[in-house]
Amino acid sequence: MGAGFTGLWTGIYLLRQSPTLRVAVLEKEIAGFGASGRNGGWCSALFPWSSETLAKEFGLDAAQAMRKAMIASVDEIGRITAELGIDCDYQKAGTYNLIRSDAQRHRAISEIELANKYQVDQLQLKTSEAVPRATRSQGAVFDPACASIHPAKLVRGLADAFVRLGGSLFESTEVESFSTGSVLTSRGVFRAEYVVDALEGYRPTITGQKRRSLPLYSLMIATEPIPGSVLDDLGLLPGVTFADFRNLIIYGQRTKDNRIAFGGRGAPYHFGSRIKAKYDTVAKIHEHLERELKSMFPTLGGYRITHRWGGALGVTRDWMASVNLNPVTKLAQAGGYVGDGVSTSHLAGKTLADLILGIPSPESRLCFVNHQSPNWEVEPLRFIAARGAMVAAGLADQIEGTTGRSSFISKIIRWLTGR
């Protein structure tokens, strides 16, 4: 259920390993309608929980294995898409997490220290001369384990590959409810030995699933095509992705056609986990993103913003991604990527396929397998918590911008989210 990255990768890996299987993917809209088709295009090794949090919960070996699997997933996406003939503008140029205040420098140093402690991530502290030339830049943390992609090209390419491998894709088929061996849809009942919930941010729209995941909106803008020489002069080289260490997340990439695609959090959570098309565009947030982009790179002020959009991503109560398979009911689920879903969904789909086929792979032993996140609180507590967290993140950035010091609020946010 769900023709996004998770559902399609699961189907593809099932059919690549067992071509005689009958696999169907059900989708209310079209393949890639959700976050998979409209995200920031970061194929990164980022994972919702930090190495430190993973180690505290699951142990050192498990944390290191999870990090290695995430890093490997970045390269595997490039390799598998090439094998499948999918042109998704995959360019592995790494990501720069810019340092733009003393408070951000403190977090950057902590991130480098954690990477050195767990000895998996190959993070590098760069000087301001060697990174994208953003205002107030004090340098950056460079992570080579990141590629930029065109998300819509990737997800539509996966849909085509899934069908070529023998899968059945049912678009315009709304899932209303599901249970062991059965899925009730707008087109009738589908029956299967295994039922996979790959709905991610849209899970709350299904009967009985409203508290399992919280739909958090992230909005984006894109510029008109910009001369490559202008972007080169800004240090925004082909395929590069960038962010900074603020609390209210922003992210960007130089696209293959020389636009800057730029997004961030800040859009409000809607009472009752509501998801509506009108929430995809919020003028105030899009205007804020435009100001932030041009504040970081004033040269870009001379170029038009031609695209504005957004969408919902899935957040679990403990901010942890998971892959689950109940061997008795044969109900499976994957999600909770908290915006880090391009690579994580690939790893989840690969893992789900192994679990369903009973293959004892290294992925099937990763710590996110059969992790159970608690339910979100009932309303209005869920609304208060989600709105409060967003306000707190923005307030923390304001305090740090004024004082130059890391705020106590930001420490609480990172503790609550496992960062």
Label for each model-derived stretch:
Residues 1-6, 24:
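Beta1/beta-strand and adjacent pyrophosphate-binding region of the FAD-binding site
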Residues 13, 17, 327-332, 338-419:
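C-terminal lid/capping helical subdomain adjacent to the catalytic/cofactor pocket in oxidative enzymes
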Residues 15-38:
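Glycine-rich FAD pyrophosphate-binding loop
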Residues 38-69:
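Glycine-rich active-site loop/strand segments that organize a redox cofactor
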Residues 39, 83-91, 175-177, 189-229, ...:
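Active-site substrate-recognition segment that forms the wall
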Residues 49-56, 79-157:
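Flavin (FAD/FMN) cofactor-binding and adjacent substrate-gating region
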Residues 61-79, 110, 284-292, 351:
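A non-catalytic, amphipathic alpha-helix used as a structural packing/dimerization or gating element
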Residues 106, 113-118, 140-194, 198:
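Helical element adjacent to the flavin cofactor pocket in flavoenzyme catalytic cores
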